[in-house]
Amino acid sequence: MSRILAVHASPRGERSQSRRLAEVFLAAYREAHPQARVARREVGRVPLPAVTEAFVAAAFHPQPEQRSLAMQADLALSDQLVGELFDSDLLVISTPMYNFSVPSGLKAWIDQIVRLGVTFDFVLDNGVAQYRPLLRGKRALIVTSRGGHGFGPGGENQAMNHADPWLRTALGFIGIDEVTVVAAEGEESGGRSFEDSCDEAEQRLLALARSA
């Protein structure tokens, strides 16, 4: 049975194009795979807290088994979020591009799930850290909407895209290196160009859902 974790990052509800497109994929996936289980984590409309000094102290405690009750409480939400990730086979992230990057809620989610000794580890080689991801056998689908055009590979604005490339880096760091990106561009200008981009994204998502 497939297990999907859907993380929605847009602060908008029905007006969110990234959310709508991700739900197109999820509905088609459930239709093709009736036994699939979908869990949703809302980080756009219900933002997660930013990490604090207490969180950092607890997360990087040299002896995790000796964390105080207060430290354990500081990591409780992170532990829950990491558990949701470990319990999934496929991660679906829907996010708009905001100011060339992702909404703060999604950045906070990444900060909560990239955990030393939990989702990544490292060894020192002559004083240099060699990082090792701890997640295995997971895939990710990033569904994104962009206000302008040309932010994809080979586009004239590719260098300004710090959204899905950054997500690829963060996910790969913890072991999710099979990542597919589906984007709709031109939301701000709208019109036929944006409609065509959405239609193309929908068709690709439907094909991915049925072939997964």
UniProtKB/Swiss-Prot annotation:
Please summarize the record's notes on activators and inhibitors of this protein. Azoreductase activity increases with salt strength.
| Domain of life of the organism encoding this protein | Bacteria
Q: Which residues hold FMN? A: 10, 16-18, 97-100, 145-148, 187
EC number(s): the record gives 1.6.5.-, 1.7.1.17
| A Pfam cross-reference name | Flavodoxin_2
Q: Which cofactor does it need?
A: FMN
| Residues at which substrate binds | 99, 131, 188
| Annotated site residue numbers, Important in the architecture of the active site | 131
Supply one GO molecular-function term.
FMN binding
The UniProt catalytic activity note for this protein reads: 2 a quinone + NADPH + H(+) = 2 a 1,4-benzosemiquinone + NADP(+); 2 a quinone + NADH + H(+) = 2 a 1,4-benzosemiquinone + NAD(+); N,N-dimethyl-1,4-phenylenediamine + anthranilate + 2 NAD(+) = 2-(4-dimethylaminophenyl)diazenylbenzoate + 2 NADH + 2 H(+)
Cited function: Quinone reductase that provides resistance to thiol-specific stress caused by electrophilic quinones. Shows a preference for benzoquinones.
Any additional notes? Rate of quinone reduction is higher than reduction of azo substrates, suggesting the enzyme is better suited for carrying out quinone rather than azo reduction.
Q: How does it assemble?
A: Homodimer. Homotetramer formed by a dimer of dimers when the ionic strength is high.
Recorded protein name is FMN-dependent NAD(P)H:quinone oxidoreductase 1
Instruction: Please give the organism.
Output: Pseudomonas aeruginosa (strain ATCC 15692 / DSM 22644 / CIP 104116 / JCM 14847 / LMG 12228 / 1C / PRS 101 / PAO1)
Ranked from the top, the taxonomy reads: Bacteria, Pseudomonadati, Pseudomonadota, Gammaproteobacteria, Pseudomonadales
Gene field: azoR1
